[in-house]
């Protein structure tokens, strides 16, 4: 499987996250109850070693973790997690951008095209899919306004991490075309 070394956009650098690259920001994101609630995840108190083990396990299971870094100062500002299904020619993406540093609407319109083009060219991926829990309003808004097709709503797909209810998930898809 071809590996991503680095993708550069005007303002950002995308690069695979190795265990030694786990940032203080990533640790902070995991501990932020407001950010984690948007993702329907519990805020935890992970150590650097915990996240490093997660990175190793992800790469072993063929899930790519791609960091988003500011080109000006190298700050780690977000993450893409990508699970490639070569048999069906698709990739499932999860995205996180640090709301204290940047907004999704500033970062993803610039980084999405570069990463999606990489998948189309290097992995022959034809379709990207993102399944977003209903509480992540900023990501849903981004996907709706940047050419992703809302394919459906999965009713009561996820148990809420807080409270006693279930949450809907919205599935988005985007067909990719490899430029020659």
Predicted regions and their residues:
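A generic secondary-structure signal
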Residues: 53-57, 118-119
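Hydrophobic pocket/interface hotspot
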Residues: 25-26, 35, 51, 93
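Acyl-donor (CoA/ACP) binding surface of acyl/acetyltransferases
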Residues: 1-22, 32, 72-180
């Amino acid at each position: 499987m071809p590996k991503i070394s680095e993708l550069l956009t005007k303002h950002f650098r995308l690069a695979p996250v190795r265990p030694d690259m786990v940032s203080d920001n990533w640790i902070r994101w995991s501990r932020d109850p407001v950010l984690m609630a948007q993702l329907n995840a519990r805020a935890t108190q992970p150590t650097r070693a915990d996240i490093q083990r997660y990175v190793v396990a992800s790469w072993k299971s063929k899930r790519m973790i791609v960091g988003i870094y500011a080109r000006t100062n190298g700050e780690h500002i977000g993450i893409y997690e990508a699970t490639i299904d070569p048999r069906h020619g698709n990739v499932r993406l999860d995205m996180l951008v640090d709301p204290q540093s940047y907004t999704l609407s500033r970062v993803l319109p610039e980084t999405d095209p570069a990463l999606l083009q990489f998948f189309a060219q290097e992995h022959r991926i034809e379709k990207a899919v993102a399944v977003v829990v209903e509480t992540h309003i900023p990501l849903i808004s981004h996907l709706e306004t940047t050419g992703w097709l809302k394919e459906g709503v999965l009713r009561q797909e996820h148990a809420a991490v807080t409270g006693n209810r279930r949450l809907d998930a919205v599935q988005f898809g985007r067909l990719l075309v490899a430029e020659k």
